[in-house]
Amino acid sequence: MSGIEKAWAAGDAGAFAALHAPMATYLAFDGTLMVGRREIESGHAPLFRGIMRGSRLLSWDRRVRLVSSDVAVATQMGGIVMRWQGDRATPSAKRVSANTTVLVRDGDRWLVTAFQNTRYRPWADTLLGRLMTRSSG
């Protein structure tokens, strides 16, 4: 998984896509679905040249479970620190996501075969959550 963060930091869409299985699925936070290395690369290349240029991908609270000797499921929190945010240690709250990554063994390396990204919005922090949990007084 560290290779993903390194490819992101380098802004290298080809290297990023190469860490995915040939027909991997990549579901972005906004619902965009990319299937296969070509779509993953072409979907990230303009981002790395544009708005995401110089950004850093961070992950934490990673949990990995081996489903079999050749399949693993990782869940983690993650987010992007944009280039204009400097040396910030954590992403801003609006850029934090919960991710699920399915990896498959390919010889001596692991490849991402499925990735799903959801913006993290704790229910209790939403307007509805606050209204439903406030105490009457």
Residue positions per predicted region:
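A beta-strand edge to alpha-helix "cap/lid" segment located at domain peripheries
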Residues: 2-14, 18, 25-137
